Amino acid sequence: MPNFAGTWKMKSSENFDELLKALGVNAMLRKLAVTAASKPHVEIQQNGEQFYIRTYTTIRTTEINFHIGEEFNEETVDGRKCKSLATWETENKMYCKQTLLSGNGPKTFWTRELRGDELILTFGADDVVCTRIYMRA
């Protein structure tokens, strides 16, 4: 079983602004979000297939607590409430499908994958994908 536990600092980010555009976030809020999320700090606790992930930015802290294969409540990148289900896509990669609880919007998901000493995080909204690469702190 892969060990995601630890503290992670972002090394690079691609397409975050494009992802926010695909989610319908206005230009002013996108600029604020891109600036605030430019240096996120992530802490992951793992006990087998149980995960607790806390992400800190300058404007907010998000927390999710989930077990692989069990639905849980969370929010999309733009703050809409959803039901999520994380499953193993490969031995080192989890895939999480998000289903909005109300309203319409693009199909969203996220993945987290361990590749060597890196944590690869992707967020998707329909066909737009944001990739963020983290290193252990």
From Swiss-Prot:
UniProt keyword annotations, A-Z: Cytoplasm, Retinol-binding, Transport, Vitamin A
Cellular location(s): Cytoplasm
TM region(s), chain numbering: none
Record has Isomerase as a keyword: no
Family statement: Belongs to the calycin superfamily. Fatty-acid binding protein (FABP) family.
Motif (Nuclear localization signal): 21-31
This protein's domain notes: Forms a beta-barrel structure that accommodates hydrophobic ligands in its interior.
Gene name per UniProt: crabp1
Upper taxonomic lineage: Eukaryota, Metazoa, Chordata, Craniata, Vertebrata
GO MF annotations in UniProt: retinal binding; retinol binding
Name of the protein in its database record: Cellular retinoic acid-binding protein 1
One GO cellular component term noted in the UniProt record for this chain: cytoplasm
